[in-house]
């Protein structure tokens, strides 16, 4: 029986901007440094490099961009956080016995932006029994290690957990460990419909 729900953050609660992907590709994917950029991004999301090191890396690839321009492009993926999703989460916390866990690939810049721009961030965070951000725990999906970390840290069995994420690679890793999954499609699904599935 499922007693724990593990949620992703982006495209589950906060919307991510499709236009960001186009902008990112336009500015970065065409670069000869693309593989190095992806490595830098992963290091940043795992908390292995500082904000300053991250920005300096990007400036070495794109010297025409200022640090503020890089920050702006980096944060432009973050969109609206509809309050009805917070209401759903609050109701779930108050009226169910599920253990609620957040497991997000993120970074210092994104979390800083969210804290500054999402007025109810503290309320959101308080809904969870555990709140795991990749740059803080030094682990990142889809690595199997991050799922084992969550299971072991909370004395959970895979079969008792439901993991909700919009990224197929992350779902595959969770499936590999026999964690129940919902591969949420942000274009057609909404987390508030969890119990309608």
Where are these regions (language model features)?
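Generic structural signal for small/hydrophobic residues in well-ordered secondary structure
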Residues: 8-11, 47, 92, 102, ...
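Generic enzyme active-site microenvironment
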Residues: 6, 103, 163-164
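Metal-dependent phosphoesterase signature
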Residues: 44-87
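Alpha-helical elements of Rossmann-like donor-binding domains used by nucleotide-donor carbohydrate transfer enzymes
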Residues: 20-23, 39, 53, 57, ...
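Asp-based, Mg2+/Mn2+-dependent phosphohydrolase catalytic module
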Residues: 1-2, 115-197
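Short, solvent-exposed loop/turn segments at secondary-structure junctions
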Residues: 12-13, 18-20, 106-110, 137-139, ...
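Active-site neighborhood of HAD-like aspartate-dependent phosphohydrolases
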Residues: 1-37, 46, 60-64, 176, ...
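Substrate-recognition element of Asp-dependent hydrolases with the DxDx(T/V) motif
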Residues: 69-117
């Amino acid at each position: 029986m499922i007693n724990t729900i593990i949620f992703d953050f982006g495209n589950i609660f906060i919307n991510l901007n499709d236009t960001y992907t186009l902008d990112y590709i336009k500015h970065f994917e065409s670069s000869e440094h693309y593989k190095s950029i992806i490595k830098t991004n992963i290091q940043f999301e795992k908390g292995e490099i500082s904000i300053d090191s991250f920005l300096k890396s990007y400036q070495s690839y794109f010297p025409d961009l200022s640090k503020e321009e890089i920050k702006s492009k980096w944060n432009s993926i973050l969109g609206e956080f509809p309050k009805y999703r917070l209401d759903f989460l609050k109701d779930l916390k108050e009226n169910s016995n599920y253990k609620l866990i957040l497991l997000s690939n993120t970074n210092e810049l994104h979390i800083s932006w969210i804290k500054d721009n999402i007025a109810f961030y503290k309320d959101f965070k308080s809904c969870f029994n555990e709140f795991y951000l990749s740059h803080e725990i030094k682990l990142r999906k889809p690595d199997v290690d991050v799922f084992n970390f969550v299971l072991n840290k909370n004395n959970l069995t895979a079969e008792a957990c439901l993991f909700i994420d919009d990224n197929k690679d992350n779902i595959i890793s969770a499936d590999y460990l026999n964690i129940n999954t919902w591969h949420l499609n942000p274009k057609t699904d909404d987390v508030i419909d969890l119990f309608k599935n």
